[in-house]
Amino acid sequence: MDIQTILEKTLPGLGYELVDFELAAQGTLRVFIDKEGGITVEDCATVSNHLSRVFMVEDIGYKNLEISSPGLDRPLKKAADFVRFAGQNAKIKTRLPIGGQKNFIGKIEGCENDTVTVSFDGKTVQIELGNIDKARLRPEFKF
């Protein structure tokens, strides 16, 4: 099995959502997890211990395993992410331009039929999930 398949099969059984993962330089495997209510250090330790054993059995090669929350600017990958975070601001980069534009910063209005609706500068744009190259939440800080 590949890393993504292992993570997608293992994490939900432990009560966590796979947000993203990356195999970085020098063999560091970073896994970003989430759950309702947020992630604690204990959650990261639990997942790390469990995945270490699973990866050993599956003979997945890596030097270091890092488990982390996705952070305030978490990536948005699936339709469910855009539904969950409707009403929040995001930065979205598309693969192909829409109206001559590839970068959008605005409020997520929702996601239906694999199409994300974003409002910005008094306009609304619809972006197909397949056209999204990168999307991240853009947290607002109020002082």
UniProtKB/Swiss-Prot annotation:
Q: Which GO terms describe its biological process?
A: ribosomal small subunit assembly; translation
Indicate where this protein resides in the cell: Cytoplasm
- S-S bonds: none
Which cellular component appears as one GO term in the record? cytosol
The answer to whether keyword Cytoplasm applies is yes
- Cite the Gene3D superfamilies for this sequence: Ribosome maturation factor RimP, C-terminal domain (2.30.30.180), RimP-like superfamily, N-terminal (3.30.300.70)
- Entry-linked Pfam families: DUF150_C (PF17384), RimP_N (PF02576)
Q: Which domain of life is it from?
A: Bacteria
Question: Which of UniProt's keywords are assigned here?
Answer: Cytoplasm, Ribosome biogenesis
Q: Fetch the InterPro entries from UniProt.
A: Ribosome_maturation_RimP, RimP_C, RimP_C_sf, RimP_N, RimP_N_sf
Q: What does this protein do?
A: Required for maturation of 30S ribosomal subunits.
Cited NCBIfam families: PRK00092.2-1
Q: Which HAMAP family match?
A: RimP
The text of the family note is: Belongs to the RimP family.
Name under which the protein is recorded: Ribosome maturation factor RimP
Species the sequence originates in? Neisseria gonorrhoeae (strain ATCC 700825 / FA 1090)
